[in-house]
């Protein structure tokens, strides 16, 4: 599904769709950050 993500509340189907949004909903600059992923949101 899609969830609001990031400062601008964009809808994202994938974490990478909004600057690698992490599970916490915080955008990080790289998927190498702990908790970041390019997998789909459930």
UniProtKB/Swiss-Prot annotation:
Annotated S-S bridges: 5-19, 12-22, 18-27, 21-36
Coiled coil residues, start to end: none
Leader sequence residues: none
Keyword line: Disulfide bond, Ion channel impairing toxin, Neurotoxin, Secreted, Toxin, Voltage-gated sodium channel impairing toxin
Presence of keyword Glycoprotein: no
Keyword Glycoprotein: no
Gene Ontology cellular component annotations, sorted alphabetically: extracellular region
InterPro entries: Conotoxin-I_CS, Toxin_19
Tissue occurrence: Expressed by the venom duct.
Entry's localization field: Secreted
GO MF term list: sodium channel regulator activity; toxin activity
Record remark: domains: The cysteine framework is XI (C-C-CC-CC-C-C).
Protein task: Iota-conotoxins bind to voltage-gated sodium channels (Nav) and act as agonists by shifting the voltage-dependence of activation to more hyperpolarized levels. Produces general excitatory symptoms.
Family note: Belongs to the conotoxin I1 superfamily.
Full protein name: Iota-conotoxin-like M11.5
Organism of origin: Conus magus
Lineage, highest ranks first: Eukaryota, Metazoa, Spiralia, Lophotrochozoa, Mollusca
């Amino acid at each position: 599904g899609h969830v609001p993500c990031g400062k601008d509340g964009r809808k994202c189907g994938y974490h990478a769709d909004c600057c690698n949004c992490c599970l916490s909903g915080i955008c990080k600059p790289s998927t190498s950050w702990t908790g970041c992923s390019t997998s789909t949101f459930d």
